[in-house]
């Protein structure tokens, strides 16, 4: 099917089909009613007139009874606001109503209100426009004439556009689709740069000239099989306009870097047909409720803050006036949306304790798994009461995924989620370990204009119990205090059984003790066992099911079997995370470096005696050595410490213009402390040599989560807090940071 047929016969009918029939419920709008500055004044007027007839009537008296004149005046006011904002979503989030000529004028209605539900939300006008003509004008000169395949509007306000490509024509979204959008943007920037050579003030027109590219929520391109998304395309403006101005870059040279962030939108299964893929992704990007999420959650300005005051008077003060636009990459939004989608499903079947067991049973039978094998797999899940008394989701996200944003976006949406006419979750609890992540989440809440009265951080059991019964909806708790949560659960048993609480746990399992006979501390299991036990003792009656969402980069097989999803693509009983962003994906996307490319082997000889039960005459004997005996071997630690010190002073510290630094990841707290003491001693001795004296002040720092069995992290760093140690390491020219992984 050629591109025009695809657009007219498939794409537009899907967008404009009623939602109850599987479409998106958009209003098909003729392109000739779109204004030159990307508004549909008649739809803006229609929305306001329907939303508040009395206000509209009152405003008409100021405009000689002319609806057209009033609509244009209102449009110009809205335009001014959006021009001064990062994008339309950020502006609408804080301007659902505006004061215009002394009246409060509604511009957008949210869904799920306590009194009206979705009644007002349905009054919003979502419009799709084919082949809208738009002139890119700078300093009064037309740079380009563009006709995006489909443009989108909300209550008459432009929110983005899409370019279509047809594989039948030998074109794809990946190549020609991305190339069209990027090329159009760069041609416009190049035209501005050329114009500015004679008229420097031309660059002052950037906001209006590039409105179509920079003010929408996102720009997309699809060939039905694949859909690509780019946000914040304006981030490339400075380099592009400078390069074009001094003739040091070309459009061809700039395109590759832009294509790196113009990413494909994920799908739930590779087995989906082309049409199923398209429908799924369009619902994710353009359904009315998803556009609402873009406005309410997924776009916000992040500011810099500093702490002021001490103790109970400690608070954050904003120190930057210009914020940085934060919005999700396709995979991040996909992950958040999947979590919310599964949570809604869980709520719908909350009163069916065997719902997920029966579904798993059907999946297994469909794959031909029967008899003892079927019962064995089901027995494994039954043994853990998985999703019976408490729901759980396991998410495997590697470094570079932006986990703090994922946790923040998820927490805020769970806080606002409604079920059966009330809040779905009475509380949302964020359990974190890293001081940096706690600070990031706190800053994120403030940047998203979340009232401080809506979230709090608790430090002990009494505060935790008080928070459960208080008005604050989001609770941030330190991981060490959370380890004592079982006692608090016992004390607040009746309260929890009548509440629905969502727990978001960062790094659900950790290995900090180093004890050879202990498995890693698993917060997921501890919490679930506590709730399962309490419910079982109470006769198995559940008032509301709690939710546990666990984040980890490296789930063990046991954790996967207990909390993962059955991989139905194979009859082998394997379990996978509910959603994943692996280290390989992070490497491929360029967010982290590939550590396997620069492995430096270190020879470390260790002598172990023959086990007492070793039989010289037996064949195929397996001799195993406890890994803690290897990691904790004193001779091995001495050799490694010596190698590290030599490598730091002779090579690492001299790199990156003399500002090289390093990090050492150790398996447990006691081993980390031992390494720290050894390395500090050796470093002190080496820095007495004239050649390395300049490194004498390079810090050797250590950071770990305090455990009562060992000396505190602060005591290992001269009494400095984790925050100060991290900041000093960041500011230092050279240094080594030892962490517990």
Residue ranges and their predicted role:
Residues 473, 628-739:
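Conserved C-terminal RecA-like helicase domain
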Residues 560-659, 676-677, 681:
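Interdomain helical connector at the RecA1-RecA2 junction of SF1/SF2 helicase-like NTPases
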Residues 154, 348, 387-391, 420, ...:
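Short basic/glycine-enriched coil/helix segment immediately N-terminal to the Walker B
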Residues 220, 475-478, 546-552, 738-739:
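Structural recognition of the conserved hydrophobic beta-strand(s) that form the central parallel beta-sheet
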Residues 1-18, 31-401, 405-427, 436, ...:
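ATP-dependent helicase/translocase motor core
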Residues 473-507, 511-537, 720-726, 738-741:
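Conserved RecA-like ASCE ATPase "motif II neighborhood" in helicase/translocase motors
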């Amino acid at each position: 099917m050629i591109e025009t047929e695809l657009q007219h016969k498939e794409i537009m009918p899907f967008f404009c089909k009623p939602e109850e029939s599987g479409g998106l419920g958009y209003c098909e709008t003729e392109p000739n009613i779109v204004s030159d500055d990307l508004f549909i004044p008649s739809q803006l007027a229609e929305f306001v007139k329907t939303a508040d007839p009395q206000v509209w009537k009152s405003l008409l008296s100021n405009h000689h009874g002319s609806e057209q004149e009033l609509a244009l005046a209102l449009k110009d006011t809205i335009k001014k606001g959006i021009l001064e904002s990062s994008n339309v979503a950020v502006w609408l989030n804080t301007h659902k109503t505006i004061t215009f000529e002394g009246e409060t004028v509604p511009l957008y209605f949210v869904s799920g209100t306590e009194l009206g539900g979705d009644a007002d939300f349905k009054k919003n006008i979502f419009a799709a426009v084919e082949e809208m003509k738009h002139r890119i004008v700078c300093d009064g000169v037309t740079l380009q004439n563009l006709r995006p395949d489909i443009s989108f509007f909300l209550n008459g306000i432009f929110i983005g556009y899409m370019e279509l490509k047809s594989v039948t024509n030998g074109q794809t979204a990946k190549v020609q689709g991305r190339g069209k959008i990027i090329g159009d943007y760069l041609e416009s920037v190049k035209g501005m740069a050329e114009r500015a050579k004679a008229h420097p003030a031309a660059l002052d027109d950037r906001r209006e000239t590039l409105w179509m590219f920079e003010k929408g929520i996102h720009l997309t391109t699809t060939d039905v099989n694949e859909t690509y998304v780019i946000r914040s395309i304006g981030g490339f403006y400075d380099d592009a306009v400078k390069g074009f101005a001094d003739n040091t870059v070309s459009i061809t040279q700039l395109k590759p870097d832009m294509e790196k962030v113009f990413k494909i939108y994920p799908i739930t299964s590779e087995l989906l047909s082309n049409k199923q893929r398209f429908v799924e992704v369009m619902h994710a990007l353009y359904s009315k409720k998803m556009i609402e999420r873009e406005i309410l959650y997924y776009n916000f300005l992040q500011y810099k803050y500093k702490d002021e005051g001490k103790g109970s008077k400690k608070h954050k003060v904003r120190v930057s006036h210009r914020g940085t636009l934060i919005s999700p990459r396709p995979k991040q939004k996909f992950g958040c949306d999947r979590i919310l989608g599964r949570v809604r499903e869980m709520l719908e079947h909350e009163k069916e304790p065997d719902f997920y067991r029966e579904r798993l049973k059907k999946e297994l039978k469909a794959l031909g798994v029967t008899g003892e094998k079927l019962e064995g797999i089901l027995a494994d899940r039954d043994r853990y009461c998985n999703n019976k008394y408490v729901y759980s989701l396991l998410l495997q996200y590697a470094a570079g995924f932006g986990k703090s944003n994922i946790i923040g976006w998820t927490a805020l949406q769970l806080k606002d989620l409604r079920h059966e006419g009330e809040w779905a979750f009475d509380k949302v609890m964020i359990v974190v370990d890293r001081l940096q992540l706690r600070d990031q989440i706190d800053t994120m809440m403030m940047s998203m204009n979340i009232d401080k009265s809506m979230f709090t951080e608790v430090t002990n059991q009494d505060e935790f119990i008080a928070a459960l019964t208080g008005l604050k909806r989001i609770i941030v708790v330190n991981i060490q205090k959370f380890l004592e949560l079982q006692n608090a659960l016992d004390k607040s048993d009746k309260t929890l059984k009548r509440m629905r609480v969502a727990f978001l746990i960062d790094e659900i399992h950790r290995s900090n003790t180093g004890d050879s006979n202990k498995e890693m501390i698993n917060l997921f299991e501890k919490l679930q066992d506590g709730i399962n036990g309490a419910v079982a003792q109470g006769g198995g009656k559940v008032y509301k099911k709690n939710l546990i969402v666990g984040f980890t980069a490296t789930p063990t097989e046991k954790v996967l079997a207990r909390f993962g999803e059955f991989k139905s693509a194979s009859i082998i009983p394997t379990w996978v995370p509910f959603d994943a962003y692996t280290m390989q994906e992070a490497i491929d996307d360029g967010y982290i470096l590939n550590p396997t490319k620069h492995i430096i082997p270190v020879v470390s000889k260790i002598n172990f005696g023959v086990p007492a039960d070793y039989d010289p005459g037996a064949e195929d004997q397996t001799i195993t050595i406890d890994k803690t005996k290897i990691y904790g071997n004193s001779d091995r630690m001495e050799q490694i410490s010596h190698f590290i010190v030599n490598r730091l002073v002779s090579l690492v510290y001299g790199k990156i213009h003399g500002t090289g630094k390093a990090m050492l990841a150790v398996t447990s707290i006691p081993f980390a402390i031992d390494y720290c003491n050894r390395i500090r001693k050796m470093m002190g001795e080496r820095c007495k040599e004239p050649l390395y004296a300049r490194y004498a002040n390079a810090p050797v720092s250590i950071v770990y989560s305090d455990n009562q069995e060992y000396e505190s992290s602060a005591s290992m760093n001269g009494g400095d807090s984790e925050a100060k140690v991290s900041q000093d390491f960041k500011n230092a020219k050279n240094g080594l940071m030892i962490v517990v992984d």
